[in-house]
Amino acid sequence: DSTVQTLGIDSYRELQKAMNSVASEAAKSVVEVIGISGEQDWTEESYDNKNSVSGLIIADNGQELLIYGKTSILRDTKEIHIRFADGTTKQASVKKKDESLGFAIYAVAKSSIAQSTWQQISIATLGSSGSVQKGDAAVVLGKPFGYAGAVGFGTIASSRNELDGDDGSYPLLCTDIGAAEDGTGVIINLSGEVVGIIDQGISGNSSKELVTGYGISGLKSEIELLSNGQAVPYIGIRGLDVTAEIEAQGIPEGVYVRTVETDSPAMAAGIQSGDIITEAAGKKITSLSAYQ
């Protein structure tokens, strides 16, 4: 005989309490990155809230606290400020940015951060988005609903879609949680690990109103490069893998170039749509992921 398990109200309360605890701890690594224009007085809290995005504390290099976030706040910005989980605000600078994907590392001098703030913040733990499955619990933090400091609970609706970007493809995570059109933030699992970076700008029309983000595993190499002040390599192609079926037709194994970005290094090198890339920097290229 099959046994039907029911979730009583007490069990639900315990589950909700546990999820809130995970969210509260993970929120210590989430900040608000604020772009200040000359006309705005940040000391009077009068800046435009639309000129801010969520950021994630990802490293401490000994001198600076490093924060990963979108570059959209940099337009017409004269100063950058970081608001930490305890509500304190400190000035920041851009350490390195990737214009192609639209993310940057922002740096805050450790010497400017008070001891009381250190007790309320933490460095994020990055998980693996590759292990995320459809139906898994999802917690969203940051500014997914258009205002900072939010938290939402739901499930992963899709974990197998990808976004074709410059020089590679990026895994996407889509949830069943409603989102603001310009939502930013993070997706965490029940272990408190960050598995996704929310960017509603990449949502398709059908999922525009649902929290969507990059799987963190596809961003780790970029985060490491930017954190070290290094540029993310950019060639400027969008391509597809040459599958076994295509290879059987006499086309060499590699990456098929679908499009070439205007004024890109690829265009300058003479690469054209329809070309097959089989080697780069002396190494054989067998797939788009290997090329990336």
Residue ranges and their predicted role:
Residues 30-34, 65-70, 131-144, 175-176, ...:
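Active-site-proximal beta-strands of protease catalytic cores
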Residues 12-21, 37-70, 89-91, 123-125, ...:
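A conserved glycine-rich beta-strand in the N-terminal activation segment of trypsin-fold
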Residues 93, 113-147, 177-179, 213-217, ...:
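Active-site substrate-binding loop(s) of clan PA
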Residues 1-52, 79-81, 103, 112-117, ...:
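N-terminal targeting leaders that route proteins to membranes or the secretory/organellar pathways
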Residues 60-104, 109-111:
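Catalytic-histidine neighborhood of serine endopeptidases
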Residues 18, 22, 190, 194-250:
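C-terminal cap/linker of serine protease catalytic domains
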Residues 47, 178-181, 227-291:
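PDZ/PDZ-like groove recognition
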Residues 111-123, 152-210, 247, 251-259:
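Active-site region of chymotrypsin-like
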